[in-house]
Amino acid sequence: PAAAGFGTADLLYSSKAAPIANWVKFGNALKLRLGLILADKDPAKAKTIIEAAAANVFTSEADNASFPYTLSTPNNNPISTNANKALTTRTDYIAAKFIIDKMNALEDPRRPGFFTMVGGAYIGGYYGFSNSYANFSTMAPKIAAYDFPALLMDYPETEFGLAEAGKRGFTVPGTPEQHYNNAVTASIKYWGGTDAQAATYLARPDVAFTTASANYKEVIGTQKWLALYNRGYESWTEWRRLDFPALAPPSAATAPAGQSVPAGLSIPVRLIYPINEQTLNGAKRAEAAAAIGGDLVTTKLFWDVN
């Protein structure tokens, strides 16, 4: 490169000994992510992309692309603004029942990093319904901190990606099980857990790579979905791509007592075009919508083939 780095303008890697080398790893990790998104649509192209990138991706948490925030406005964690308002003046931020039940069933050691306890337990509310705020877990203080960083790409995601690439038959370093174990361990430690807790967790038959499921997409997809907590768009993409964990559509959801579920609802798999596109570019918007099967939240993107 023409220079050793971008100096203090580089908010991700300026503190590293070799910032450009870190950016190269970030670029390759991003290629791995994009290659996997293509894998069911175009396996040959995905294989080429992933095998070219796999040898120089993230190798530890030190490589994380972590965007820093400060304690000073306006440069603080944007989640903290809403979160702290919710904790003081609003009562509509609680943990969802599905993720709480899933993590409770697995005795997941990341729960203290994700959520608060209520009466000595982690309790989730019904998503989208009226819930009594005091009776359910809320987000952990760590997430609501003004200086809690935003992960753009992290080591666990990369390790899960390498595990999947190996299971797909692509040539990457290491074994799928090694990468899976590395990913789960790193995720647990990031959220405040220990190596010992990770080892105990990975020894569970419902977590272990070889016994949790015969379907690698379920094994990797479930744990990757949990590891992507607080990264909604990426976890949504992974769920659409791998179809795990198995989420119930709203029409099949169980409602709290005295409430009901509207009929005909499904889980969105895309965002519709914004209203200004419909208003200012109506003809082309209609043309594009027709080409993809309709401007609907149920229209799958081109790579979502399963």
Residue ranges with predicted function:
Residues 188-306:
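C-terminal functional modules
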Residues 1-193, 210-217:
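Structured, solvent-exposed acidic/aromatic patches
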